[in-house]
Amino acid sequence: TGAGINTFPKTVWGFLRLLMSPEIMTLFLAMLSAYILALCLKAPPLVALIAGATFGLGSINVLYLSAGHVTKVKAISMMPGVLAGVIYAFRSNMWGGAAITAFFLSMHIHANHLQMTYYLLYLIAAVGICELVAAQLKGQIKSFTITSALLIGSALVALSPSFPGLKMTKDYSHYTTRGETVIQNSERTEGLDTDYILEYSFAKAEWLSAIVP
């Protein structure tokens, strides 16, 4: 999505930036997203509120923002909302769940951080497997199939506005430090420098701070 192309997720992000700073807006959306997920998991409103605040204000989000990983935090902030939509579609209302999924997934994809999208697919697959087993035990495979098809459709709708940007990312990825190698040396066994890869990662004793606001 170029500067002159207005899409739904781009318009939403742009509108929210008028209301608050980008960093605060991203953390707010992370809290809202996790709050909705907690509600879809039948948590009491107060518990859902605490869960949302804890997720949004987690140390890892603040660390990533301060390190300049803005698109990563934007992508992470939408992930609970996507899972909420999938769960709501299977357990309550498939149309409502599909709408929630399409909204949050379009916002997530617009962030254009494919590493986080890759992780999100694993989470969705885990939820899907659990729901498939539950549907099998309840004899509701037909309902599961219809809901799954609807969610796939909502994913395609969410993908369409950001497809040009994703295509551009794919084209230019070959010219980055993480793209294809331009040096043919069979003796080289190392990739990126370890310090470069783990510069902003937690040490072994720090991982608990990821869930402490």
Each language-model region and where it sits:
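Generic amphipathic alpha-helical segments used as scaffolds and interaction surfaces in large
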Residues: 12, 25, 116, 120, ...
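Membrane-embedded helix bundles of polyisoprenyl
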Residues: 25-41, 45-134, 147, 151-169
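Generic detection of long, well-ordered alpha-helical segments
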Residues: 15, 27-28, 146, 197-201
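Short hydrophobic helices that act as membrane-entry/anchoring signals
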Residues: 14, 135, 209-212
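Membrane-helix interface linkers and caps
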Residues: 138-140
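Juxtamembrane segments of multi-pass membrane glycosylation machinery
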Residues: 1-22
